[in-house]
Curated annotation (Swiss-Prot):
Purpose: Catalyzes the reversible transfer of the terminal phosphate group between ATP and AMP. Plays an important role in cellular energy homeostasis and in adenine nucleotide metabolism.
Domain of life (superkingdom): Bacteria
Residue span of region LID: 126-136
NCBIfam families: adk, PRK00279.1-3, PRK14527.1, PRK14528.1, PRK14531.1, PRK14532.1
GO terms of biological process kind: AMP salvage
Binding site for AMP: 32, 37, 58-60, 85-88, 92, 133, 145
The protein's name in its UniProt record: Adenylate kinase
Pathway: Purine metabolism; AMP biosynthesis via salvage pathway; AMP from ADP: step 1/1
Family: Belongs to the adenylate kinase family.
Subcellular location: Cytoplasm
Keywords noted in UniProt: ATP-binding, Cytoplasm, Kinase, Nucleotide biosynthesis, Nucleotide-binding, Transferase
Amino acid sequence: MPRLIFLGPPGAGKGTQAERLAAIYHTPKISTGDLLRAEVKAQTPLGCQAKVYMDAGELVPDEVLIGMVKGQLQQSPEQGWILDGFPRTLAQAEALEELLQELGQDYDYVLNLEVPDEVVVARLLARGKEQGRSDDADRSVILKRLEVYRQQTAPLIDFYEAKGRLQRVNGNQPMESVQEHLQALLEGFRRTA
């Protein structure tokens, strides 16, 4: 079963593609964004704390996310997993490497969905209207999220490229085309593994 990490700016389609691959391969999708939004919706103490960061377009503290991810990775390791929205910083990537080593797990690919900023902004504004997500409804918050992505998440591209695990994917095309590309990539990996 595949073990994948999705990277890319907000609005690149990571969640959509992760969900599609999870359904095809019967693999759990682990989305820190979904986990955090559930906490916010339930108005738990963690959710209220996280909402402040999310509404400002900032990242939720590492220790919160790492603990959540560890719990998810331990549930059914034989089914594989697809990480969506984690890691987002070099510190998180290094912590994930340590965590996977501790759990005796590894990942197959890091899939970086590449999408131009103007497309990201348009996608997120549309999603904000459709889904009522406060972190997607305000252009200034979206621009802040892109700035945070460039500063904190984009360095992961070099980190994973140096490990020979990064696959760049054009996310600025129809969803079906992106999915077909990802499936072909995974099928090629399964044949050589």
